[in-house]
């Protein structure tokens, strides 16, 4: 069996063990798992890299924009340590953080990707807690500036949509005015 197939099987096993028990479903036979909340998705992606292994992306996708692709509107790449602690921003200048699980052999990868899947599950729970409803999304988006590499128009659109759906017409109007 090729390294790529072994990696895929081990990711599937680890994700099934950590993500399925908390309610995530797998998209077909892909490396993508999701929690459908009706108005949003929480997405966990074991992203392939150049060689055998995986990166880990976990974030929320708002469903009020009509798209035919998966997106990370809030969150994405995760960084973690061997003790399971995690960050959503690159920890510059600090040793011991990783963002990629390299495949060296099946035993090592199985152990390391199991930790990554546990980190993904913990981040999913954090996002569920952070965004229990649309009003919480609106509060969050309205209170933060547009991030680097984020489109100001998409940020304003998402803030406006969340505010409108959360019942704050004035905030929705202010946000949508930035889009038009």
Residue ranges and their predicted role:
Residues 1-7, 33-180:
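Intrinsically disordered, low-complexity regulatory regions enriched in serine/threonine/proline
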Residues 28-32:
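Acidic carboxylate-rich catalytic motifs and surrounding loops in phosphoryl-/glycosyl-chemistry enzymes
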Residues 5-26:
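Amphipathic alpha-helical segments
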